Regions:
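Positively charged n-region of N-terminal signal peptides that target proteins for export
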Residues: 1-5
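The canonical Cys-X-X-Cys-His
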Residues: 33, 40-47, 98, 133-143, ...
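Axial heme c-ligation environment in periplasmic c-type cytochrome domains
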Residues: 51-57, 73-115, 148-154, 172-197, ...
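Short, solvent-exposed interaction modules
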Residues: 109-152, 160
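Electrostatic cytochrome c docking/interface patches
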Residues: 19-37, 52-54, 104-130
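Sequence context surrounding c-type heme c attachment/ligation sites in exported
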Residues: 34-38, 63, 127-137, 156-165, ...
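The feature marks the first
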Residues: 21, 28-76
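Bacterial N-terminal signal peptides
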Residues: 6-14
Length: 207
């Protein structure tokens, strides 16, 4: 039986507000980007499918979201210790090309832990009215594909350990500079550890 799963990671996740699809000027070149990602493969996999849970999978991620994240990391707006210095010598066009490369790769879908399935599905599709938690589908779509024009990320197949950390960082306020409207912070603040883990597992198997 196939389940269509997903989560609130407007994380890993950022939203800068809705916008149009990337203009010709904004678009990068995937073939050029392929030549720039060799150093990225150690953590994110050769094709963007991470093999280690703590590192996010980038394969199939929305172009606009990827580009926004790379720009934030390079400018210091999003601090990731492991990424320190990694983008310093790259131009903005390089960031566009890298984003284009990963956006056209096929993401790998994982398996949902059975004991987390029901809670994760309920939260993702219905939210929690008593706690004021909205359904994740509003921004991330029923299949976890995100919203490319609005720069809301693809969640389908994302690594559960990474999603768990992202949501906990939103909840604590550690991850705040990338989301001016504080939507993810407000949502994550209302989630307990059990709910976060259920959502993280759920999105890993979402398709």
């Amino acid at each position: 039986m196939r389940f269509k799963l997903s989560i609130i990671f407007i994380s890993s996740i950022l939203l800068t507000g809705a916008g149009d699809a990337p203009s010709v000027k904004e678009k990068g070149d995937a073939e050029t980007g392929k030549q720039l990602v060799s150093a990225c493969s150690a953590c994110h996999g050769a094709d963007g499918n991470s093999l280690a849970g703590i590192w996010p999978s980038l394969a199939g991620q929305n172009y606009k979201y990827l580009l926004k994240q790379l720009r934030l990391v390079k400018s210091g707006g999003r601090e990731i210790v492991e990424m320190t210095g990694q983008l310093d010598n790259l131009s903005d066009q390089d960031l566009k090309d890298i984003s284009a490369f990963y956006s056209v790769q096929n993401n790998v879908i994982g398996q949902v832990e059975k004991d987390k399935l029901e809670l994760g599905r309920k939260l993702y599709y219905s939210g929690n009215l008593e706690k004021g938690v909205p359904a994740c589908t509003a921004c991330h779509s029923p299949r976890g594909l995100g919203n490319a024009p609005a720069a809301y990320p693809l969640l389908s197949g994302q690594q559960p350990d990474y999603v768990t950390k992202a949501l906990k960082d939103y909840r604590s306020g550690e991850r705040s500079n990338e989301d001016p409207s504080k939507i993810m912070i407000a949502i994550a603040y209302k989630l307990d550890d059990n709910e976060i883990e259920a959502l993280s597992s759920f999105v890993h198997g979402l398709h």
